[in-house]
A protein has these predicted regions:
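Local pocket/hinge segments that shape ligand/substrate recognition
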Residues: 41, 174, 236, 269-376
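Gly/Pro-rich hinge or "lid" segments in bacterial periplasmic/extracellular proteins
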Residues: 64-81, 177-240, 244, 254-255, ...
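Bacterial N-terminal signal peptides
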Residues: 7-17
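Aromatic- and charge-enriched surface segment that lines or borders ligand/interaction sites
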Residues: 93-138, 152-154, 160-162, 259, ...
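N-terminal lobe/hinge region of extracytoplasmic solute-binding protein
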Residues: 37-99, 130, 204
Length: 376
């Protein structure tokens, strides 16, 4: 029955001609072989004309803005730990701290330019920090205010941060695991009376792409590779492959699968296990993170059974512990994610280096753990 429903849905989608995302609607004039089409995991953006990524409750940041247009000092592989992959992006090297970790110095790359031709300098970094400290409602303002005393630029490629107290992790604010403090274009924002009310439309980018067009209803965004991509930090890896990248809201999981089967969606961010099984069987050109089950990269988060602590019974931690021990989490995983969910006995996922840091030391304690209910 499930197969029949899927076939019927696929036939319906074919007959409708992909009415939501008919290629003529958003790829007009763009050859299909020059564009990479990716799912926007945020779906439809409700305020699509807003590109000021530095304010709380901003517009979309998974619509290509963060991925293709923004840049900051460093990137790391969060799964690899502190001795793992470290990539200097806008910075030319790792941060340098003084002996007591109250001062951090950063050297910046030469030859990096904003998409409007203005050179990126230390003034942009200083402006980014000071502006958000002066406007603590901005996204990174509170974090900067908590740690930072002053930030200065001795020259156009050096930034010095003086901290209020020792903090050997201050650089983490500028280090991307998924997100970080993106650098603002000083020459654009300094002209605005209130940086929190500026829509930054169209965005001036440090990344290798610029915004070409977008749907006023927030359904799709198209980005075009910069002619001067060599003047971005990504150039150290070579020329970006696709000339265009489209981020779209492809709809629910079933529709994403159908679109990929029809080569209308190149990258799926999320789908159901059933959807991945369908792609694995029917689409030779579709590949997951792994060749086989569970296909996807284990996310550093945990699907979970969440209890409402406002309910009187659940306010008692012993009740919550009892339920945690009573519920068969393997059955929950099989019923909800076909066994593809990451399972953990504690509030930390067993991915990356976490097994070494948390699970191995706690293994014996977890195996022997019992809860005293007061009843025999």
């Amino acid at each position: 029955m499930r197969v029949l429903r899927l076939l019927a849905f696929a036939l319906c989608g074919h007959l409708l001609g992909g009415q939501v995302f008919a290629q003529a609607n958003f790829l007009a004039g763009i050859p299909r072989n020059e564009v990479l089409i990716a799912e926007n995991p945020q779906g439809r953006i409700t305020n699509p004309t807003w590109f000021n990524i530095w304010v709380v409750n901003h517009g979309g940041d998974s619509n290509g803005l963060q991925q293709l247009g923004m840049d900051t000092l460093w990137y790391i592989d969060a799964d690899a730990g502190i001795d793992g992959v470290w990539d200097n992006s806008l910075a030319s090297d790792k941060p340098t701290y003084n002996a007591d970790f109250t001062e951090m110095t950063v050297k910046l790359r030469d030859g990096i330019f904003w998409s409007d031709g203005v050179e990126f300098t230390a003034d942009d970094v200083v402006y980014t920090v000071e502006t958000q400290m002066k406007n603590p409602s901005m996204l990174w303002g509170p974090a900067f205010l908590a740690s930072l005393d002053t930030v200065t630029a001795p020259d156009k490629k050096t930034v010095v941060f003086k901290l209020k107290r020792p903090n050997s992790r201050f650089h983490a604010l500028f280090t991307v695991r998924w997100n970080a403090a993106w650098i603002m274009p000083k020459h654009i924002f300094e002209k605005q009376q209130d940086p929190t009310k500026f829509d930054f439309n169209p965005p001036v980018t440090l990344g290798p792409y610029t915004l070409k067009s977008f749907d006023p209803n927030g359904e799709w965004y198209i980005w075009q590779r910069r002619d001067d991509w060599q003047r971005t930090t990504l150039a150290r890896f070579g020329e970006p492959g696709p000339k265009y990248v489209a981020y779209i809201d492809p709809g629910p999981p079933d529709k994403r699968v159908i679109m990929q089967l029809n080569h209308q969606l190149d990258i799926i961010h999320d789908t159901s296990p059933e959807g991945m099984f369908t792609l694995a069987k029917q689409s030779p050109s579709s590949h997951g993170w792994f060749k086989g089950f569970p296909y996807a990269h284990p996310d550093p988060t945990l699907p979970a059974v969440i209890l409402n602590n406002q309910v009187d019974a659940f306010k008692n931690k012993d009740v919550r512990w009892a339920l945690a021990l009573l519920i068969d989490i393997k059955a929950v995983s099989l019923a909800s994610y076909r066994g593809a969910a990451t399972i953990s006995a504690i509030g930390v996922p067993p991915t990356g280096l976490y097994p070494k840091y948390y699970f191995d030391p706690l293994e014996d304690w977890l195996k022997s753990f019992e809860i005293d209910t007061g009843k025999s």
